[in-house]
A protein has these predicted regions:
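N-terminal Rossmann NAD(P)H-binding glycine-rich loop of SDR-like oxidoreductase domains
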Residues: 2-30
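Hydrophobic residues within alpha-helices
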Residues: 16-21, 108, 163, 220
Length: 241
């Protein structure tokens, strides 16, 4: 797909999603971002200097709000969808929004189905951001990190597995990005890539401890938005340093 794309963002107020949004905007693409508090993004991307960003206030579990983000200016479905939804951990190591990803995916797929029923056409490529430590085909993280994923990140992983399973079974076009433990700060470190087919198994392996949120978002923009590389379509992609 060439030319200017319209890309919908969910969970782009911070972290990986924010980085992907920044680089997509900088490339001149039209972006629509759903956020509960639009002022978080207008503080970073002022309306006067970012005419290619449309903000929609709402919740990712509301079909009506999500639907508003999925319609491009031509009246058809957007070209791509980037979802980096996730729940913060509370003081007891629980999730502040249990099932946030699973509910978010259910809502997204329901919104797409309703819009198509209403006559809109298109097959957006859906990119979701997850974590290593949840492969069905063996260990995809350093051995020392296995206890961390099994305890501290157990509930978020359970939620993301449900979400990703729904996406894989949906028949939509997708790429699932599994980042190793996320750090802060843009770097020039080499990014290593592993590819896994969610139904057929692992094609290549990359095991590492961490990668920054900024670098992950930039990689998503470069390889899945600015140029959608076919080798990543219908695949799980591990990104790590």
């Amino acid at each position: 797909m060439s030319g200017t794309k319209t890309v919908a963002f969910f969970g782009a107020s911070t972290g990986v999603g924010l980085s992907a949004l920044k680089h997509t905007l900088a490339a001149g693409h039209q972006c629509i971002a759903l956020c509960r508090n639009p002022s978080k993004l207008t503080a970073i991307f002022p309306t006067s200097t970012t005419p290619n960003l449309k903000l929609v206030q709402g919740n990712a579990h509301d079909v009506a709000a999500v639907s508003k983000c999925l319609v491009a200016s031509n009246g058809q479905l957007v070209d791509e969808i980037i979802s980096s939804l996730g729940a913060a951990m509370n003081s007891t190591m629980g999730m502040d929004q249990p099932n946030v990803c699973a509910k978010g995916m259910e809502t997204l797929l329901a919104a797409l189905a309703q819009l198509r029923k209403d006559g809109l056409t298109g097959r957006p490529h859906i990119v979701v951001v997850g974590t290593t430590g949840m492969s069905h085909f063996g260990r995809d993280c350093p051995l020392l990190m296995v206890p961390v994923y099994a305890t501290m990140v157990k509930n978020p992983i359970k939620d993301k597995k449900i979400s990703e399973g729904r996406l894989v079974d949906s028949g939509e076009s997708y790429t699932i990005v599994h980042a190793s433990m996320l750090t802060d700060g843009e770097t020039n470190k080499k990014i290593r890539i592993g590819i896994e087919d969610p139904k057929q198994g692992r094609e290549s392996m990359a095991i590492g401890y961490n990668i920054s949120r900024e670098d992950t978002g930039k990689w998503i923009a470069d390889h899945l938005v600015l140029q959608l590389e076919g080798k990543y379509v219908q695949k799980i992609v591990v990104v790590t340093n």
